């Protein structure tokens, strides 16, 4: 039954399946058809959009090209304006050149006249100069005779001065010799002082007091000697000053004469300067003439350059015109090519969009990855640089620290040595002073103990304070002596200053008298100048006649000016006719009318008028050309509409063909779907079998998973335990390392200090041996006692000292034995860099302390080491002690301060616990040092040995049986011997003083001899005075001769005594001779100067005469100059009147120019204010009344200007009428274009409506609303075509180039892109 039912069911199922498959296929077909239709519509819309975009781009490019054409036209117009300006500048330059030429010719004529007058004056001046030279030669001969007399007097005085100088230099030589002897004595003292300090530092301070007292006495004696010598030198200086005063009187006479000569030379220089000034004026006039000639040539050259530039500009204009024509041809070629490019552009557009999208994605990915890689590389580089910098810094700091450590150690050792040496030296030095008696009485009670450092310092302070007080007294005395010397010098300088002031007063009185004489001369000059003034007045009357001639020339010039004005009037009439015929607006020249001459202005105006008429004709041609272009564009619009209709028909045919293809594809898809259903059923059976197998595998995996979970829990517990142990051990190791390293560093430092102290002890012993040897070498007494002591010492050594050595050796051996038994060490570690510093590593306490043989001991040692290294008790103690620290570590925050304090406290507690437990484990190694206890015990063996040694040493000292003499005795012996040396030195100094007294006696005898020499010199001076005075009698002369003979006898006796000093005086004489030779040279130069001065006086007199003549000539020239200036003023007044007339005309023209500017501004404002669609150029009306009211009362020039303005107004009205007609035509064109646009827009809307109706019919049977709505959304994409741009009118191009773009129409959809908006119309 079941089989039958299954067989009946299968055909029904198959039929249902077939029906379902058919329904599905139909649905798919309908869906595919609707999708295809929607896609096609979208493509259609896209094509239309692209077409619109192409048209907009085409319009945009056209507008850009047209704007370029407009720019080129503007540039051409600018070139023409520039040419006009250059022509205007050329005319101005010609005018200025003509004026300059006339002025230069007039200046040349004036300069020639002045040159002729100056030549005549020059000849007169030359004659006067010859007369002055003759008078100057006569005065020169007289002056030479006076100079010769004066030279004889000077030679006699110089001889006297030379003798005085020789004596003064001999005394100065003696003074230098005495100073040298003093310096030698002082040097000897210093040498002796250094020798004594090197030999005996200990007794230096004691001797210093005595020596300072002696030196002060010697210094005072030397000062007295020096003062005596200074007094002698001062007496000599006074004599020399007297001689110098005489010499100064002579020099004053010379100075007066030189001052007179200088005055004459100054006067001569003034005259020369005035003469040079006149010559310079003449030269300047000549240079001005030459400069004017050069300026004239330059103006000619500049005019030629301007003409060349104008030609170049004309050539450039022609080139630009040719380039414009080429540009127009290129534009037409580009338009043809653009149509061909549009077809290719549509094909390639799709490919480029896809490739651009892919490219953009790839570029974004590439840039993102590149940025990431660069950032990573930069971060790594920064990290590397930072690390390298830190490494270098750490290496440097490490090296510097090591160097500083070594230096500090060396410095510390050196300081310790120096400190000890200083203490010893201080002790030895202070022992020899009187202050040390108190110290020794207070300190040397215990002879065995050395003196303390504080006591030594106190004694030093006392001694130093005593010496400081004495030094201050000595320094105060020296200061007072220095102050006295300075006051003496100031007094001497004041005396000299008073003398100099008196001399200057006398000179001033003399100059006053001289100036009064000059005033009298000047009054005579004034009288002569008055006579010359009368002559000048006659000349002025002559120049009045010249002025009358100039006035007649001015009248002639005014007649020529009237003729020019008549010519200008005729030209203006012709210009008016041109303007009436042309009917063109003209721009005024830019504010330079007052520089033009009438002929030049007329030429420029005529050229401008011709150019403007030509521009008007060109503008008319352009308007006709633009109308032709508008017609062509309307034809192209019609053609585009036809092409669009053709494309729509083609698209409809393509849609029908695609519908037939879609039906075929629908049938094929139904067949494929049925085959796929059968394959799905087969695969479902296979997948059921695979699922059963997988369920069995899952059960097995679950059992294995449970086992793995158990193992994992076990491993986690073990791992947590090991982690705890590891952390505890790590903390313990860290704490132990922190404790061990500083202990080890301290032990190293202690070892180095121990070595250093050992070296110091050795050096101390060596120092003691040296002191003893010194004492033995110096004291060669009690040799027999020493020999007896040596024999007793040998016996003493053999009995006691040998026994003590044996006892100490036994004690050391027992201690070493005990240490070896108690210590359980593993090994000793030695640092490689620091040799000799070792570290002992021990094991825990051995349980049984029995004695074993050697081979068993080694085995036990290995077993103990192994048990200690792998002991569980030790691990337990470490973990138990570190539990508290582990708890704190787990809870700590690195940022909080409280946690830090808790962590340090926990570490401290755990370390204390660990050390307590380790001390109980390692009981064999004593942690606390017991050395201090053993040394402190009263009945210890070490203290007993020390007491015994002390007793033996005291007994040996009593009987003199000690092997080594104590240091205190040796130092006392040294002090005694040093005291003996000082006594000997004292005796030697007493002998030295006696020798000094002998030297002073010798010097006194020399001083007496000098006094006699002074007397002889005074007699010689008196003799010289008698010679100079003419009223000396014969009896006085004989008495003076007798006195001189007596003085000569005395001098002979003195020379017998002074033969020893003759050698030193010879050197001084040699120097004096050199000085005298120099003075002789100076005297010769003075004589030559006097001669030159006399010659200069003669020249000055001659030049005075020549200057007077020149002054007369100058007054005449000045009068001529005044007359010429008056003539120039008259001419300038006439020119000013003409300039005023020109300015009146120019002002009138400027007012007209301002009015025209206002009109231009109104035009531009009306353009900007106007709307975009209804723009019309409305020119403002200019009333003739405004210009007529501004009419000026003037000559024919003003009337001609007013006539020209009226003609301009007529032309302006004609132009405004023509422009209004053109604007009306443009408005009619605009209305036509607007109607065309509205028709186009309605046609496009109709097409869109037809497309929408077709779409609604196709989608009426379908149930998918989203796809049916798609074409409705895209309706807005179909837009009307835009109109192309209208061309601009050149006359108003500059004001409307940058206007805003127009919208196409008010009904355009919002989906249009911004690029599609173009300006509708630009221009008139």
UniProtKB/Swiss-Prot annotation:
InterPro entries: CCDC171. Signal peptide: none annotated. The keyword Zinc-finger does not apply. Residues 29-296, 325-393, 453-521, 599-712, 981-1145 form a coiled coil. Keywords: Coiled coil. Residues 1301-1312 have a biased composition (Polar residues). Residues 1301-1324 are annotated as: Disordered. This is Coiled-coil domain-containing protein 171.
């Amino acid at each position: 039954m079941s089989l039958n039912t299954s067989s009946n069911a299968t055909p029904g199922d198959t039929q249902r399946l077939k029906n379902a498959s058919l329904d599905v296929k139909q649905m798919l077909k309908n869906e595919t058809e609707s999708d295809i239709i929607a896609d096609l519509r979208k493509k259609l819309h896209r094509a239309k959009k692209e077409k619109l975009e192409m048209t907009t781009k085409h319009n945009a490019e056209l507008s850009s090209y047209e704007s370029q054409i407009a720019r080129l036209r503007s540039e051409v117009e600018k070139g023409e304006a520039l040419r006009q300006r250059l022509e205007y500048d050329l005319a101005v330059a010609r005018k200025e050149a003509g004026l300059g030429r006339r002025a230069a010719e007039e200046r040349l004529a004036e300069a020639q006249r002045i040159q002729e007058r100056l030549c005549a004056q020059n000849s007169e001046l030359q004659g006067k100069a010859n007369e002055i030279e003759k008078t100057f030669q006569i005065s020169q001969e007289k002056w030479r005779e006076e100079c010769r007399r004066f030279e004889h007097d000077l030679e006699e005085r110089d001889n006297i001065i030379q003798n005085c100088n020789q004596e003064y230099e001999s005394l100065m030589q003696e003074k230098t010799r005495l100073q040298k002897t003093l310096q030698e004595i002082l040097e000897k003292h210093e040498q002796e002082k250094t020798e004594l300090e090197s030999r005996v530092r200990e007794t230096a301070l004691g001797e210093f007091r005595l020596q300072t007292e002696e030196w002060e006495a010697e210094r005072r004696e030397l000062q007295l000697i020096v003062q005596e010598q200074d007094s002698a030198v001062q007496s000599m200086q006074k004599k020399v000053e007297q001689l110098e005063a005489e010499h100064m009187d002579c020099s004053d006479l010379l100075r007066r004469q030189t001052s007179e000569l200088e005055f004459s030379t100054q006067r001569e220089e003034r005259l020369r300067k005035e003469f040079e000034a006149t010559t310079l004026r003449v030269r300047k006039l000549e240079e001005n003439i030459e400069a004017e000639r050069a300026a004239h040539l330059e103006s000619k050259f500049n005019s030629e350059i301007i003409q060349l530039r104008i030609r170049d500009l004309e050539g450039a204009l022609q080139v630009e015109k040719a380039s414009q024509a080429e540009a127009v041809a290129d534009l037409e070629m580009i338009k043809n090519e653009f149509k061909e490019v549009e077809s290719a552009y549509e094909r390639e557009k799709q490919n480029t969009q896809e490739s651009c999208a892919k490219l953009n994605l790839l570029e974004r990915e590439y840039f993102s990855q590149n940025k990431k890689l660069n950032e990573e590389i930069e971060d790594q580089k920064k990290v590397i640089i930072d690390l390298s910098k830190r490494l270098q810094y750490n290496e440097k700091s490490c090296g510097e620290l090591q160097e500083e450590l070594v230096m500090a150690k060396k410095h510390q050792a050196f300081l310790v040595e120096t400190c000890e040496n200083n203490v010893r030296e201080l002790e030895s030095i202070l022992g020899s002073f009187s202050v040390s008696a108190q110290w020794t009485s207070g300190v040397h009670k215990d002879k065995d103990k050395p003196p303390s450092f504080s006591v030594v310092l106190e004694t030093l302070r006392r001694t130093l304070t005593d010496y400081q007080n004495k030094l201050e007294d000595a320094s105060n005395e020296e200061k007072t002596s220095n102050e006295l010397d300075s006051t003496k010098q100031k007094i001497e300088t004041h005396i000299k200053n008073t003398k100099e002031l008196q001399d200057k007063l006398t000179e001033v009185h003399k100059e006053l008298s001289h100036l009064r004489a000059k005033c009298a001369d000047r009054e005579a000059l004034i009288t002569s100048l008055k006579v010359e003034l009368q002559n000048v007045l006659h000349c002025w009357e002559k120049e009045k006649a010249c002025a009358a001639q100039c006035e007649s020339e001015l009248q002639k010039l005014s007649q020529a000016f009237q003729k020019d004005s008549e010519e200008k009037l005729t030209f203006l009439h012709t210009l008016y006719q041109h303007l009436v015929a042309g009917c063109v607006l003209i721009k005024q020249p830019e504010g330079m009318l007052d520089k033009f001459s009438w002929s030049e202005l007329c030429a420029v105006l005529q050229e401008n008028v011709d150019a403007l008429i030509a521009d008007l004709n060109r503008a008319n041609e352009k308007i006709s050309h633009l109308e032709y272009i508008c017609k062509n564009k309307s034809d192209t619009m019609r053609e585009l509409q036809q092409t669009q209709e053709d494309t729509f028909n083609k698209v409809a045919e393509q849609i029908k063909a695609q519908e037939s293809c879609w039906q075929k594809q629908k049938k094929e898809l139904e067949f494929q779907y049925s085959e796929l259903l059968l394959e799905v059923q087969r695969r479902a059976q296979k997948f059921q079998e695979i699922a059963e197998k997988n369920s069995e595998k899952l059960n097995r995996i679950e059992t294995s998973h449970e086992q793995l979970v158990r193992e994992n829990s076990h491993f986690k517990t073990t791992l947590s335990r090991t982690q705890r142990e590891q952390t505890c051990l790590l903390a313990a190791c860290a704490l132990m390392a922190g404790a061990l390293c500083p202990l080890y560093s301290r032990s190293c430092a202690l070892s180095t200090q121990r070595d250093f102290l050992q070296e110091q002890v050795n050096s101390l012993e060596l120092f003691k041996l040296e002191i003893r040897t010194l004492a033995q070498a110096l004291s060669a007494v009690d040799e027999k006692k020493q020999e007896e002591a040596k024999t007793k010492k040998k016996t003493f050594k053999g009995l006691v000292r040998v026994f003590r050595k044996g006892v100490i050796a036994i004690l050391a051996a027992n201690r070493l034995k005990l240490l070896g038994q108690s210590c359980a060490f593993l090994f000793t570690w030695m640092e490689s860099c620091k040799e000799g510093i070792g570290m002992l590593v021990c094991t825990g306490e051995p349980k049984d302390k029995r004695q074993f043989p050697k081979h068993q001991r080694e085995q036990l040692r290995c077993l103990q080491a192994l048990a200690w290294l792998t002991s569980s008790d030790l691990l337990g103690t470490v973990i138990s002690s570190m539990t508290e620290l582990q708890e704190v570590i787990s809870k700590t925050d690195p940022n909080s301060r409280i946690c830090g304090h808790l962590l340090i406290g926990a570490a401290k507690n755990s370390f204390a616990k660990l050390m307590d437990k380790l001390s109980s484990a390692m009981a064999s190694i004593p942690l606390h040092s017991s050395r201090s206890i053993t040394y402190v015990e009263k009945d210890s063996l070490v203290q007993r040995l020390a007491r015994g040694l002390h007793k033996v040493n005291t007994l040996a000292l009593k009987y003199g049986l000690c092997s080594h003499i104590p240091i205190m005795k040796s130092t006392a012996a040294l002090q005694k011997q040093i005291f003996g040396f000082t006594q000997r030195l004292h005796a030697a100094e007493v002998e030295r003083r006696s020798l000094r007294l002998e030297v002073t006696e010798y010097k006194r005898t020399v001083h007496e001899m000098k006094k006699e020499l002074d007397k002889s010199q005074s007699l010689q001076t008196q003799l010289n005075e008698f010679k100079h005075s003419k009223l000396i009698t014969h009896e006085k002369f004989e008495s003076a001769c007798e006195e001189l003979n007596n003085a000569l006898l005395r001098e002979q006796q003195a020379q017998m005594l002074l033969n020893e000093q003759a050698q030193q005086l010879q050197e001084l004489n040699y120097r004096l001779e050199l000085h005298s030779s120099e003075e002789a040279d100076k005297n010769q130069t003075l004589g030559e100067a006097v001669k030159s001065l006399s010659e200069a006086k003669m020249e000055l007199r001659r030049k005075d005469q020549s200057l007077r003549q020149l002054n007369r000539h100058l007054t005449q020239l000045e009068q001529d100059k005044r007359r010429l200036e008056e003539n120039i003023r008259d001419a300038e007044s006439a020119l000013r009147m003409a300039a005023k007339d020109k300015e009146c005309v120019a002002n009138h023209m400027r007012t007209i120019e301002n009015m025209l500017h206002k009109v231009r501004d109104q035009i531009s404002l009306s353009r900007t204010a106007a709307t975009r669609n209804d723009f019309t150029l409305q020119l403002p009306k200019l009333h003739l009344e405004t210009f007529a009211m501004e009419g000026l009362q003037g000559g024919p020039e003003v009337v001609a200007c007013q006539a020209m303005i009226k003609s301009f107004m007529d032309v302006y009205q004609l132009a405004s009428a023509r422009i209004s007609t053109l604007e009306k035509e443009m408005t009619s064109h605009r209305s036509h274009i607007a109607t065309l646009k509205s028709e186009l827009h309605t046609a496009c809307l109709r097409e869109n409506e037809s497309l929408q109706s077709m779409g609604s019919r196709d989608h009426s049977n379908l149930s998918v609303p989203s796809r049916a709505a798609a074409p409705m959304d895209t309706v807005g994409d179909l837009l009307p075509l835009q109109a192309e741009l209208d061309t601009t009118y050149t006359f108003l191009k500059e004001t409307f180039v940058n206007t805003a773009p127009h919208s196409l129409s008010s009904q355009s959809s919002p989906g249009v892109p911004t690029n599609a908006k173009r300006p509708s119309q630009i221009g008139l």
